[in-house]
Amino acid sequence: RRLYSGPLLLTFMLTNQCVTHCKYCYADTSTQIKSPLTTQRMMELIKEASDLQVQQVNLIGGEIFLHKDWKIILKELVKRGIAPEFISTKMPVTQKLLQDVQETGYQGIVQISLDAIHSEILTASLGVNGNYAKEMLHGLQLLDDSGLNYQISSVLTNYNCQMNVLAELLHELSHLKHIRDWRIIPASNSIYKEYNVFSHLKPTKAQITKVFNQIRPLLTQVSFPVILGKEVTDKNYQDTWGGSRCFKGSECSA
């Protein structure tokens, strides 16, 4: 007998539009959406999800803050107690955006995706203008002063897999007083990118191990946790003898 009468979690992709053009993008940002769900239909689906006792509805993009009614949608999720655990954005934060988020009553985590503070690196890897880094750092300070929960996430590629690049970003983050944590995650394959192109973006296992070992001594100097994504260097799959009974990964919950 199944324990649940409906899904535990739903995900709404509000838009596939974005403010960046990341070389490693994991989203389908090229498909032209001819008939997007209306906000009214989304509200109906949110009610259905609530009635089915869905525990959480995630919001993803593209950039969710580019959807014209993101505030209405998020506020409804908050009201029904099924808001996402975190919302991820690469958009430079403004005071108006923070005010809008606060007005929804959202108590989850705002995840800021920032891979470096070098304008040249960000322009090459994200396709942004030369002011992007400055705008992101200004937005981080506003976010730090806002009282909202937030964390930083960086995708590790051949553009930023260098000790000096990560150390400079860490130095900037160390000035923030309320940061929850910083996550450094090596890039993984994207189904929307040609593998022979994408493979050039991915740092090798040796590169990742080296830069993690180099930066680890600096992590004791900051007051917030820094989470190093070691799945690539410490993977268990394809390394196990004895079949599935000896597999060190998670058990199937079906």
Go through the PLM ranges and name each one.
Residues 1-108:
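Conserved alpha-helical substructure of the radical SAM core
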Residues 113-115, 119-253:
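Radical SAM enzyme [4Fe-4S]-AdoMet core and its adjacent flexible, acidic
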